[in-house]
Amino acid sequence: MILQAWRSLQLLYLLEAISLLPCTEALLCYEATASAFRAVSLHNWKWLLLRSMVCNQREGCEETVVFIETGTSKGVLSFKGCSSAFSYPPQISYLVSPPGVSIASYSRVCRSYLCNNLTNLEPFVRLKASQPMSTLPSAKSCPSCVGKHDQECLPSFVTTENCPFAASSCYSSTLKFQAGNLNTTFLIMGCARDSHKLLADFQHIGSIRVTEVINVLDKSEAVSAGHCSQGISWSVLLCLLILLRD
């Protein structure tokens, strides 16, 4: 009888302990995507957070922002939503550092109520302020733009950029960013250290899947080699890019 009573008491203690354990509730996170290439400024860009979503159990809230600069043009692509990744503090760095085309990213995963609440580009302001400026010029110039093939990067909107000495190769690629409702294909052109893939080591930025197709211009030259000279103009190549867009 004593043993049975003791076991019953142990069971009661166990049930009480279980009842005191915190419940694993689904987390509420902001849900948003952004893809902007016009009038983007480090100081006046604002992200309106209007939607939220309920995540699956054990998922956290993610926010990933990519900031791109080439010449005087800027672009922002970003994703907010649920993530199964482990939590990690804010991480900000240059994936491709200046001079020339630069690509920086900010990303974090958190696990508290609506914690993915970044609404501005302040982290990139601080990152850019810490980067030394390069002013030594070269004799090279390249077309420069970032944006949609049929919008911001139409030939009439493409500018010519004088390249710094440390980034005197002309770069051009079509990038595709995909995450949740974010599905954006865009063109980036400008001065770079070389003309190879800039994001070869970054198939994912946070949850954003990155696809980079490089040397579209070279492909155009190869196709038209029988009809055009190798000195084909950038404006003609840009027109070909428009025809090749998705």
UniProtKB/Swiss-Prot annotation:
Regions crossing the membrane: none
Domain UPAR/Ly6 stretches: 142-223
Known glycosylation sites: 117
UniProt cross-references to InterPro entries, sorted A to Z: Fert-Immune_med_protein, LY6_UPA_recep-like, Snake_toxin-like_sf
Keyword check for Transmembrane helix: no
Keyword terms, alphabetized: Cell membrane, Glycoprotein, GPI-anchor, Lipoprotein, Membrane, Repeat, Signal
CDD domains recorded: TFP_LU_ECD_LYPD4_rpt1, TFP_LU_ECD_LYPD4_rpt2
Tagged with keyword Coiled coil: no
An annotated GO BP: single fertilization
Signal peptide (from-to): 1-26
Lipidation positions, renumbered (GPI-anchor amidated alanine): 225
Chain positions listed as propeptide in the UniProt record: 226-246
Primary location: membrane
Entry GO CC: acrosomal vesicle; plasma membrane; side of membrane
Membrane topology category: Lipid-anchor; GPI-anchor
Pfam family, one: UPAR_LY6
Superkingdom to which the source organism belongs: Eukaryota
Places the protein is found: Cell membrane
Protein name: Ly6/PLAUR domain-containing protein 4
Provenance organism: Mus musculus (Mouse)
Organism placement in taxonomy: Eukaryota, Metazoa, Chordata, Craniata, Vertebrata
